[in-house]
Amino acid sequence: MVNEIFEHTKENMDKSLEALKRDFASLRTGKVTTNIVDNIKVDYYGTPTPLNQVGSVIATDATTISITPWEKNLLSDIERAIQEANIGVNPNNDGDFIKLFFPPMTSEQRQEIVKQAKAMAENARVAIRNIRKDANNKIKKLEKDKEISEDESKRAHDEIQKITDDHIGMVDELFKAKEADILKV
């Protein structure tokens, strides 16, 4: 029973880490990646469809993303979706493909993105602590219902705290790496 709680706790904390990694991937760093446009949805015959499913999306260099639609009639829809996404660039439509030119980031922009990353990391820490709280409550209930002894309860709480500390440490490492990536000129 207690081992199931440990596994469930670890699994949920791992999901929080994966969510943080996805959030971090959407942040712009010094080098442009296609992750910046991952959340953009294009109106594809009335259905919101991810941009990477209606065309080829590649980073041609450190400041440019090129989008080649599989159907030429989607160019204006893709252009509109990019403008509505408000990612800080205007699409450049040349009739065959769309280019996004990202200007170099200023130090103020970098600091603002670091703030966003810090908030994302803090949200992940809070989520992990909430998972710990749920697990501890389950352990307390088992102890209260006399399914485990007080000593087993103490050991279980210590193990849950260790799992929590490990995951909080991973959040901190991810944030430090992302911060360094953002601030790198």
Curated annotation (Swiss-Prot):
Which gene is the coding source of this polypeptide chain?
A: frr
Q: Which residues form a coiled coil?
A: none
User: Main site of residence?
Assistant: cytoplasm
Q: Which family does it belong to?
A: Belongs to the RRF family.
Organism name: Sulfurovum sp. (strain NBC37-1)
**Pfam hit, one:** RRF
Fetch the InterPro entries from UniProt.
Ribosome_recyc_fac, Ribosome_recyc_fac_dom, RRF_sf
Record localization: Cytoplasm
Question: Which Gene3D superfamilies does the UniProt entry name for this protein?
Answer: 3.30.1360.40, Ribosome-recycling factor
* Membrane-crossing residue ranges in chain numbering: none
What GO MF annotations does this protein's record show? ribosomal large subunit binding
Q: What is this protein called?
A: Ribosome-recycling factor
Q: Which GO terms describe its biological process?
A: cytoplasmic translational termination
Q: Residues of the signal sequence?
A: none
Sum up the protein's function in the record's words.
Responsible for the release of ribosomes from messenger RNA at the termination of protein biosynthesis. May increase the efficiency of translation by recycling ribosomes from one round of translation to another.
Keywords for the protein's UniProt record, in alphabetical order: Cytoplasm, Protein biosynthesis
Instruction: List the GO terms this entry assigns under cellular component, sorted alphabetically.
Output: cytosol
What is this organism's lineage?
Bacteria, Pseudomonadati, Campylobacterota, Epsilonproteobacteria, Campylobacterales
